[in-house]
């Protein structure tokens, strides 16, 4: 973790939801946490946003992902729809070397240009899962609505 107050923000959400929360700093700690949370159906792992260009940071994320057995993991790659297409391609290419993933697009409220959602979906073959459109948690996150995105791509619903 390196974002200021990120852990406290997650702890606040965990308290609101009345669920346990653990903080780990490397993949070596994952085994103990997995054993501790073994009775839960779902364990969410939130990693800090990292640059795909930084090899050390990519390696850290890869070790963390690979510390969870493949049959137990479902990876969501979170991308801003405002990021340039070429950069989105590089990001998805980098992380596709680590694991399969589903896509979450953020900041739909900050742009009228949603073409990158379709472009990246087609380039990666990854499933579109969620989208965010504001700062209000959890109100501004929803499952991806393909019909709404198609309508906006075609110039409607602005």
Language-model segments: residues:
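Conserved phosphate-handling catalytic cores of large alpha/beta enzymes
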Residues: 129, 133-158
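Conserved ATPase-coupling elements of RecA-like P-loop NTPase cores
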Residues: 6-7, 52-58, 87-89, 113-116
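Short, surface-exposed amphipathic charged segments that create phosphate/polyanion-binding patches used
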Residues: 35-39, 119, 142-149
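Cytosolic-facing regulatory segments adjacent to core modules
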Residues: 22-34
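P-loop NTPase switch/communication element
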Residues: 1-24
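Conserved beta-strand/loop subsegment of P-loop NTPase cores
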Residues: 45, 71-79, 96-133, 138
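Inter-motif core of Ras-like GTPase G domains
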Residues: 35-45, 57-82
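Conserved nucleotide-binding/hydrolysis micro-motifs of P-loop NTPases
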Residues: 1-4, 28-29, 49-52, 81-85, ...
């Amino acid at each position: 973790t390196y974002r200021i107050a990120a852990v406290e923000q997650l702890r606040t959400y965990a308290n609101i939801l009345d669920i346990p929360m653990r903080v780990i700093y490397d993949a070596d700690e994952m085994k103990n946490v997995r054993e501790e949370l073994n009775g839960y159906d779902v364990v969410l792992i939130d990693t800090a946003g990292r640059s795909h260009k930084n090899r050390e940071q990519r390696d850290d994320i890869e070790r963390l992902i690979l510390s969870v057995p493949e049959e137990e993991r479902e990876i969501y790659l979170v991308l801003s729809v405002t990021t340039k297409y070429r950069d989105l391609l590089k990001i998805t290419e980098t992380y596709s070397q680590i694991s399969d993933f589903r896509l979450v697009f953020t900041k739909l409220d900050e742009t009228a240009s949603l073409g990158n959602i379709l472009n990246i979906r087609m380039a990666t073959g990854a499933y579109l899962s969620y989208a965010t459109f504001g700062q209000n948690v959890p109100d501004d996150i929803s499952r991806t609505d393909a019909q709404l995105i198609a309508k906006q791509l075609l110039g409607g619903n602005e």
